[in-house]
């Protein structure tokens, strides 16, 4: 019932601060707003290793439960605020994550590293991760059989209808408010579960 009520709600429309409409969304090749970053580590270093998961970018020891031992020569440095994704997938779905957790971090050599220019990074990450149209198109662009690969070149060549930068900023601010509310609800649920366990101790 609640789901049907949500589906009947009017589509959100974002406007300028003066109430005017933003320009129509324009088809844009991602390569026009993606700036690749290529810097690698070799030998001893003090960078922490991050893993790009569907739940977000995570410290490797948090993701696997322990610190992994392996050769990190050739790993890609990912500066704070830059984006990455695991280019291999078992089901054709890819997660694009922004580094918001570490100033000195590296990711696998198979993870392209880049940033968005003349675009809002928060909006773009949410758009690539959440839009059904994007997911469908990226799954088509990926190649392979049991495990498919979305190359960085294929990603940059993909074209999508995108709003102007000002509208992206508005949408991103709204999404960040929603994310904050979601995190607050998760904290509340965790506290209630802890309280519930205490009742029956």
Predicted regions and their residues:
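Short, solvent-exposed loop/turn positions at domain surfaces
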Residues: 16-19, 66-72, 144, 176
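Sequence-specific dsDNA recognition surfaces
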Residues: 31-83
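Extracellular/lumenal glycan-associated surfaces
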Residues: 169-181
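Non-catalytic DNA-recognition/assembly elements of restriction-modification systems
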Residues: 13-41, 165
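Conserved small/polar residues in nucleotide/adenosyl-binding loops
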Residues: 1-5
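Amphipathic alpha-helical coiled-coil segments
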Residues: 178, 182-185, 189-192
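A short beta-sheet element
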Residues: 74-132, 139
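A short glycine-rich beta-alpha junction/loop motif
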Residues: 105-110, 143-166
């Amino acid at each position: 019932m609640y789901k049907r009520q949500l589906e009947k709600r009017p589509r959100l429309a974002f406007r300028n601060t003066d109430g005017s409409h933003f320009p129509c969304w324009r088809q844009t090749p991602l390569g026009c707003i993606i700036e690749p970053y290529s810097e690698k580590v070799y030998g001893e270093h003090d960078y922490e290793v991050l893993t790009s998961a569907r739940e977000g970018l995570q410290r490797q020891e948090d993701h696997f439960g322990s610190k992994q031992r392996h050769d990190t020569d050739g790993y890609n440095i990912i500066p704070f605020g830059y984006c990455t994704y695991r280019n291999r997938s078992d089901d054709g779905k890819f997660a694009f994550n922004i580094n918001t957790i570490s100033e000195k971090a590296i990711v696998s050599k198979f993870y392209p590293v880049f940033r968005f220019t003349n675009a809002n990074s928060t909006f773009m990450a949410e758009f690539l991760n959440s839009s059904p149209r994007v997911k469908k198109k990226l799954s088509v662009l990926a190649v392979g059989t049991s495990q498919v690969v979305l190359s960085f070149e294929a990603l940059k060549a993909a074209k999508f209808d995108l709003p102007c930068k000002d509208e992206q900023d508005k949408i991103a601010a709204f999404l960040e408010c929603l994310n904050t509310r979601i995190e607050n609800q998760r904290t509340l649920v965790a506290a209630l579960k802890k309280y519930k366990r205490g009742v029956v101790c």
